[in-house]
Amino acid sequence: MKILLILVIIVFTNNFFAQKTFSSKSVLGHELGTEFSTHAQVVDYFEELNRVFPNNSKLEIYGESNEGRTLQLIFIGSENTIKNLEQIRNNHINTSVNENIPIVWLSYNVHGNESSGTEAAMETALILLRDKKEWLDDLLIIIDPCLNPDGRDRYVNFFKQYSTVSKNSNVRSLEHQEPWPGGRFNHYLFDLNRDWAWLTQVESQQRIKKYNQWMPHVHVDVHEQGINENYYFPPAAEPYHEIITDWQRKFQEYIGENHAKYFDANNWLYFSKEIFDLLYPSYGDTYPMYNGAIGMTYEQAGSGRAGTSVVTANGDTLTLSDRVEHHVAASLSTVEVAYLHKKELISEFQNFNNDFSYTYQSYVLSGDSYKLNALRRLLAHHDIQVREPKAGSVVKAWSYSSQEKTNYKIKQNDIIVFVDQLKGPMVKVLFEPQTFLSDSLTYDITAWSLPYAFGLNAFACVTELPFKGELPEPNEFSITPIPNDSKDAFAYVCKWNSMESARFLERLLSTNVKVKYAKKSFQLDGNLYEPGTLVIARGENSELNIDSLIIQASKGLELQMNTCSTGYVEKGNDFGSSSYHEIQSPKIGLLAGEGHSPLNTGEIWHYLEQRLKTPFLMSRPNDILDFGLSNLDVLMVPEGRLSAELVDEIMTWVKSGGRLVLFGESVENFFDELSIELTDQTDEFYEMSEREELSEMITGAIFNCKIEKKHVLSFGYDTYYTLRQSASRYTLNAGKAVFELPKNSKAISGFVGSNVIEDQEGALIVGQEQYGKGSVTYFIDNPLFRGFWSNGLLMVANAIYFVND
């Protein structure tokens, strides 16, 4: 007994001593707030923190970034809370169970070069564990110290390489001038704070899985802004989405009042109720809001120009230590407010997820199975349930395409997305035909309705619909779409109607299979095949084991493919006709570097590497000038500015047969050489107020397009809705406008300024023109925007494989 008592005393004494003497410097090699910590050091820090405070913390690795860096959470609470994490989680998710532990989730550094956030996360965790035990008795705090470790290390490594020993505070010093692309973005140059809902990036996918397992009551997204700005905290600016409750608004006022108390005591300046609104659903504040939490953004002066110290416009010196201190104060104040309102947080969260008094109760989605399955996979990531309807029943509904009420007869394979579920509010936000704007002055796009983004027919119903049952998440396909007698087949024909078709084509070309596409529609064995259909003839691949290669190329893909016993078609041109064009495997280049939009560059990069899975060459502008373009067939140019010398080099290459693909305003580099022109330009804004500017703007509105269906760029499209983010109107004097806005064009959804509503008729969306032996494709509205406009992906493949074939 005496020995046991001695052991208990020793363990207690050692734990007490360790907690009192925990040293950040001993782990990091520097005091917090004096230097930037690398991500490896951050991982070590939290491992040591968990070792020193084992009873009040649990460390969990939830994934890794594109570049293999650890994504982790630390759970902080009382000893009893940490022992019973799974029970607490189950009690919370099952809202019928009486729960008493609110969950506060603090997220830091979603933008890599806003790098004081992770330093603040380390300090906040230490203070909570060491000094705030009374809060831990009644709260569970989850900290994600770095949502974007690849971007953060990109910035931290730059700063360590170029900062002087004395840490020059002059903003013109090299250490304050990040090189392209900067640390804000992740590996693929995506803005992870715009990806919460769309989940195009692996970091987002892994984080959202963990988030939805916990569904916190409070979520804070910690950011930085320009070096001359004062600290921002809620309440947020209008517009608020209409589903945000009075309680969610009120809690933001509690937060603002409590933060102000601490900031006032330290004479720190701040602002609220401006700039940062609560509308676009893919932010780190709105996504939690639409899932019942109190979602908030905090913004500290800093970012990539700040370094560890910088002289601001008013002559003050902003230090890393200042930035960390402000974030720590706001973080701890958040936990305190949650502690003071813990009962309300629990009850109001439950109320939010039990109130579905929305206009539309069900959404019927109809379309090709691959589009429906792509949508279902996204919804499954968000834990949104989908139902199988009763085919043949007729429902009264609002039609997304006709923009009017109609009677719709439900088809086989249609799906129902319904609001009477835990994620019902999120369903409303993602599917509503039009988003209500309480204020048109907003921080981001104003339209995103998923049926338009995925190219699906949709019908919104005011009632809950009868159904057969719940539909599970679609499995990855493992299709072998080849009959047993395929070895006697004359050819294989595959419809061109999705990115699955494009990936299938790319796989075939990589194994030297000869593939042709149909320039015109044809009918065979009673099946109608539209232009773009792929034809793989056995006779043209006689030296290959074509059956085996097709089986391999089709694995994991959902394709509409058949075999045929003859090349003699029932309607249209026979397979030996010159109307079937052979597809060559293209050598693709992507222009990247200084002067180009990192975001648009990343969208194209991600598309080529992750969507299409094709090899390509990424080159800086100077490399093009040094080595030329003769080894490329296709050059993709993201938004940005080019030198006159580079424009000449590119146009010489196009004239000799190159295929140029231009995105957005990159077309303006070629006004002197090509027929495209800017016919209506937004007025200069410098003499206008912020609200006056709105009359000249389009802030992410959805329009229906007129399509030239005989052109190769339209292969695979019957309809297309574009997401316009600019009021500038481009037109082509030669070539072909393949997708354009029709007469009397009005926005289907989203905000359009009063002075530009009438100016959109005939606006070019996607077009193409010949230049010498080559061609130029224009994507004025970016079909790869943030990777979420799913129905835009195929037209980029059309530009790569079919244009100027």
Regions found by a protein language model. Name each.
Residues 169-180, 320-330:
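Short, compositionally biased "basic patch" segments
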Residues 14-18:
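Sec/Tat signal peptide C-region and signal peptidase I cleavage site
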Residues 141-155, 696-701:
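Short, conserved secondary-structure transition motifs
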Residues 153-170:
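Aromatic- and acidic-residue-enriched segments that line the glycan-binding/catalytic groove
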